[in-house]
Amino acid sequence: MKVSVLITLAVLGVMFLFTSAEERGSDQMDSPAWLKSMEIIFQSEERECRWLFGGCEKDSDCCEHLGCRRAKPSWCGWDFTVGK
């Protein structure tokens, strides 16, 4: 039941977006710009270091107390150290 409600809300949201684009008199749908803005939202933020399970190439890419696990794909994992 919850899934069907979520799907219905998603469909209504998409219909609203396309309807509002038509009402503005736009010949082009704004979906590419809209999709690009959504992509920015879902991208991980650029940080000085990678958090747990983040992609890495070397140990210095990972945050403190994390090391680069070189199993494919490479990811940051706990290096078994503790402290401040």
Curated annotation (Swiss-Prot):
The GO cellular component terms are: extracellular region
What are the alphabetically sorted keywords of the record? Amidation, Disulfide bond, Ion channel impairing toxin, Knottin, Secreted, Signal, Toxin
Question: Where does this protein chiefly localize?
Answer: secreted
Compartments (UniProt record): Secreted
Q: Entry's SUPFAM superfamilies?
A: omega toxin-like
Q: Which residues carry this modification: Valine amide?
A: V82
Write out the function statement from the record. Answer: Probable ion channel inhibitor.
Q: What is this protein called?
A: U21-theraphotoxin-Cg1a 2
